[in-house]
Amino acid sequence: MEILFSISILALLFSGVVAAPSDDDVFEEVRVGLVVDLSSIQGKILETSFNLALSDFYGINNGYRTRVSVLVRDSQGDPIIALAAATDLLKNAKAEAIVGAQSLQEAKLLATISEKAKVPVISTFLPNTLSLKKYDNFIQWTHDTTSEAKGITSLIQDFSCKSVVVIYEDADDWSESLQILVENFQDKGIYIARSASFAVSSSGENHMMNQLRKLKVSRASVFVVHMSEILVSRLFQCVEKLGLMEEAFAWILTARTMNYLEHFAITRSMQGVIGFKSYIPVSEEVKNFTSRLRKRMGDDTETEHSSVIIGLRAHDIACILANAVEKFSVSGKVEASSNVSADLLDTIRHSRFKGLSGDIQISDNKFISETFEIVNIGREKQRRIGLWSGGSFSQRRQIVWPGRSRKIPRHRVLAEKGEKKVLRVLVTAGNKVPHLVSVRPDPETGVNTVSGFCVEVFKTCIAPFNYELEFIPYRGNNDNLAYLLSTQRDKYDAAVGDITITSNRSLYVDFTLPYTDIGIGILTVKKKSQGMWTFFDPFEKSLWLASGAFFVLTGIVVWLVERSVNPEFQGSWGQQLSMMLWFGFSTIVFAHREKLQKMSSRFLVIVWVFVVLILTSSYSANLTSTKTISRMQLNHQMVFGGSTTSMTAKLGSINAVEAYAQLLRDGTLNHVINEIPYLSILIGNYPNDFVMTDRVTNTNGFGFMFQKGSDLVPKVSREIAKLRSLGMLKDMEKKWFQKLDSLNVHSNTEEVASTNDDDEASKRFTFRELRGLFIIAGAAHVLVLALHLFHTRQEVSRLCTKLQSFYK
């Protein structure tokens, strides 16, 4: 009994010693808020991992004086509720940091409030986006999208691929996080041939199938996918149905997409797909933590890799916060500091340690992790094929592509024949202008003979590249030709003919530089004779009448002024009348010889001769222009207001040179509106019959078609530029268009402007246009008459005074 009593006393004393409070056992508490959607698997993992990590941390570091107290708030997936929860944590609970932000909207709201409260907000869900860089207190603790973008770009360059198709989710956080990748493509010269976006709420199977059919016609063989798990599962079901998981295609998934893909039900339709994943170094600590995390979660994790990534990042965030709190509180700063959050943020930024997810380092408010695992999805599991780190690949292994092929997907390789590659070229065979392109089958052998200006230019441009040409006639519409070339890439490589470069066709194919003059012209018949009264054409009737009236008026005024002092204007009334008319009309040819006595009449004649000089010059110039060029009375806005297709459609099926000429001669057509090459051939054959009176550069000329992304496009374009600079294109035009050097064809904008000016000058002058001259002349006549009447009145007054004095 005494022994039991003694043991009890010792136990009480021992427990008292252990439980007795001391200064060392009083912890300094720092509150941290977790704002997550507790109904989501990511939110549950974050909360569980955070608490488990703190428990492990303080179990090892039980001598630390500080403790991080976790305050959890459920955002319910609503950004507004998340904002309210964060406000409550900062204002009422006095939280010194917040962890959360599962969407871009939440991140922007929490980042805004963190700027005002000067409290750090840490997100483990969102990739780096440009719109969040402006917030100084917002830290993105995810993979480095800049390094990832460089890795994807480098991988595509290894395929020698110059164009890709980008497929992404139509949501703010997904589209924004794609910008860095797009910029890398542009910097490295990778062309985005097509792009498509899909929203979770509106992207059913039919919509996806329609969009993917449009993407299929692009010549790009590499597809980059950036979207959530639910959309990826829908996407690849459609991709498989459309035959886009065959040998000729490559699919690359971004890390944000690939991190959440684990289920076999999803990946079984994705065999051969390549994905970037956040790299997690394998260690016993990682295995131990993830094992305990699954037990805590009750094996409720939906995806293995995603739960590991989120859990390990949450673990490292908890540890770095606990370390940071301890560092600046050793000397009692937690109690003394008035701004714990600012000190905490500064300590986090300068923290360096090795965590479960890798080496921890913060730069520009984002976690730096340049290492990515590259995986290849197989029949049953994912297989690592390499690592991307520090700007280079390592541990590379062979890739098994879609269709179980081990060959790198490329554009269709040209068929080979001996030492030369065969280029299969579609030729427009329905053209009725053989000068441009002509396809004639040999009746005995059946072999097509292809000739014409377009064909000769193409053969000359392609000759340096050692291709054997196989011409295939095509008798359909040129718009359909572009679509055919883009969809039948295994059969055809290029197209040649009178093919105008248009924006619609450029959606399906790539064009070379134009090798013909650009624009549309107006052609009409030259006028042989313009009638016996052509000399009246330069002036309208009103101007002729006004001019005649002023000639007579000038003679009358000069006669009135001069007749009292000048003998040449005196005599009988008949002599005076003839002198008036003679003097007035003789000024037309400046043939007046009479010497004028008074200054006023001389002044009047000088002014009138100036007016006559302008009238005669205008008359001569206008008469000359009407004899030089036959004008077309066209409403240019009506003629050039439509597209090339609508204008040439007015001609129906009339395309042959002879048909044009005959219809113009017999008056069925007054003018022809068509592209410059067609009109050049017509004028070349009949240079004395027709003339081009105007042109507008609203079309892009003829070009050669190639499949999207073809390496031959820049090469052939350079050859076209070389032919033009050497004058060889002009020589070919002379050969096929005949007497081109004698044509009245305008080759540049300045000449067209000059022709327009000549056409305007050939219009009849009206009295309204030259009324300024007659106002000047009229003012001179009125002034001279007024002076004459004033002097006459003085003389009459003096005469009356003399008569009055005589009678007196």
Swiss-Prot record:
GO CC terms: plasma membrane
Glycosylation sites: 288, 339, 504
InterPro entries named among the record's database cross-references: ANF_lig-bd_rcpt, GABAb_receptor_plant_PBP1, Ionotropic_Glu_rcpt, Iontro_rcpt_C, Iontropic_Glu_rcpt_pln, Peripla_BP_I, Solute-binding_3/MltF_N
Superkingdom: Eukaryota
Compartment(s) of residence: Membrane
GO BP: any one term: calcium-mediated signaling
Record CDD domains: PBP1_GABAb_receptor_plant (cd19990)
Disruption phenotype: Increased sensitivity to exogenous abscisic acid (ABA) and higher ABA levels in leaves.
GO molecular function, one term: sodium channel activity
Record-annotated membrane-spanning stretches: 542-562, 571-591, 603-623, 772-792
Side Cytoplasmic, residues: 563-570, 592-602, 793-808
Membrane-protein topology: Multi-pass membrane protein
SUPFAM superfamilies per record: Periplasmic binding protein-like I, Periplasmic binding protein-like II
Known tissue expression: Expressed predominantly in roots. First detected in the root-shoot junction, and later in lateral roots and at the margin of matures leaves.
Residues in the signal sequence: 1-19
Extracellular compartment spans: 20-541, 624-771
Pfam families the record matches: ANF_receptor, Lig_chan, SBP_bac_3
Keyword Cell cycle: no
Keyword list, A-Z: Abscisic acid signaling pathway, Glycoprotein, Ion channel, Ion transport, Ligand-gated ion channel, Membrane, Receptor, Signal, Transmembrane, Transmembrane helix, Transport
Role of this protein: Glutamate-gated receptor that probably acts as a non-selective cation channel. Can transport sodium, potassium, and calcium ions. Functions as a carbon and nitrogen regulator and/or sensor that regulates carbon and nitrogen metabolism and distinct physiological process such as germination through the control of acid abscisic (ABA) biosynthesis. May be involved in light-signal transduction and calcium homeostasis via the regulation of calcium influx into cells.
Family statement: Belongs to the glutamate-gated ion channel (TC 1.A.10.1) family.
Subunit and interaction comment: May form heteromers.
Protein name: Glutamate receptor 1.1
Gene transcribed to yield this protein: GLR1.1
